[in-house]
Regions:
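Hydrophobic small-molecule pocket/channel-lining residues, especially in calycin-type beta-barrels
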Residues: 1-151
């Protein structure tokens, strides 16, 4: 008989989410997207508070885009959490897109791939936090986007 135990068999420990994830609370809720794109975007915390889940249903450049994104710290088996808040989005065209999230005050930065990438979103929250206006920038183009919270 062989021992097939692994990390999932370890006794449950009382893990708590990294406090830096709290900045993502600004995104929680349902939003209407407008500008060069239109549709709906929603964010909700996954049970446990380690990951923010984004649901996207928008039209961009005449194409419908549906996606789900998991946002939080990477933590492979046996390793420490990543220092950056990272995400991976999966869309209805088969793309997997990786990002790094930063929220400083009312500024939202989403880097495509790694920090400092030439592909990024830079947006500004209104003082009440119910509107985020910004622009996706990437080497061959970009687009303007406004998200308005509806609940």
């Amino acid at each position: 008989m062989s021992d097939t135990s692994g990390p999932m068999d370890a006794p449950a420990r009382a893990a708590t989410p990294n406090p830096d994830l709290k900045v993502l609370d600004k995104l929680v809720g349902s939003w209407i997207a407008s500008g060069d794109t239109d549709g709906t975007i929603s964010y909700e915390w996954m049970e446990g508070g380690f990951f923010l889940v984004q649901h996207v249903d928008i039209t961009l450049f005449g194409h419908r885009v549906k996606a789900i994104e998991m946002i939080g710290h990477l933590q492979p088996f046996g390793e420490q959490p990543s220092p950056d808040i990272r995400s991976r989005a999966y869309d209805n065209s088969g793309n997997t897109l990786d990002y790094v999230y930063e929220i400083n005050g009312n500024e939202l930065m989403i880097w495509g791939g790694e920090k400092g990438s030439p592909a990024y979103y830079k947006g500004q929250f209104s003082p009440d936090g119910n509107v985020n206006t910004g622009e996706w920038v990437y080497p061959d183009g970009g687009y303007k986007s406004t998200m308005t919270r509806v609940k």
